[in-house]
Regions:
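C-terminal accessory/tail domains of diverse enzymes
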Residues: 1-171
Length: 171
């Protein structure tokens, strides 16, 4: 069980000759501000980031980079949501790759706006999802906020209980 799984074969050894059909990403937190837990904008941003990571040069020492990444991930995850990213966070490499990708493929304003949102979130932690949740914490809990959202989403979903609402644009 990991954050990314290879999919498409019933037996792992089959990946060697038959290949990977798709990747399953399992590490996304649900966005409570979105009725279906994730927005199309977020999915498009993740897609663009994945392409940018493929675009970037590989690290010369992958094991060392992964170890440093795990340490940095823990540091960021345990920091206050409004705390700026640590200085060792190499956001410039990512944003440069995003800019190059958008320019190389002639992607339009929508994708340029996605890159701008990523840059803005790197520079200003108040734009992150974690920071947006801060005002909703009452007595060190998000329970009241979560219940309010759940009830509102439930009520909306039952306006036409036979329809799978919210996924129409994702088909």
């Amino acid at each position: 069980y990991s954050a990314v799984r290879f999919r498409g074969q019933k037996v792992n050894r089959s990946f060697l000759d038959k290949g990977i059909t798709y990747l399953e990403f399992r590490n996304f937190d649900l966005n409570p501000f979105e009725r279906i837990g994730i927005s199309q904008t977020t999915m498009d941003t993740v897609h663009l980031l994945l392409l940018a990571f493929l675009w970037m040069d590989a690290s010369e020492n992958v094991d060392q980079s992964l170890a440093q990444g795990h340490v940095l991930n823990e540091k960021i995850a345990l920091s206050h949501p409004l705390e700026p990213l640590p200085s060792e966070t190499e956001t410039q490499n990512i944003t440069t790759a995003l800019d190059q990708l958008v320019q190389h493929f002639g992607l339009g304003d929508y994708h340029q706006d996605l890159v701008k949102q990523v840059k803005d979130a790197f520079a200003d932690p108040s734009q992150t999802l974690a920071a947006q949740l801060l005002p909703h914490i009452k007595d060190k809990s998000l329970a009241d906020f979560a219940l309010d959202k759940a009830l509102a989403y439930h009520d909306y979903d039952w306006t036409a209980h036979y329809a799978l609402k919210g996924y129409e644009e994702m088909e």
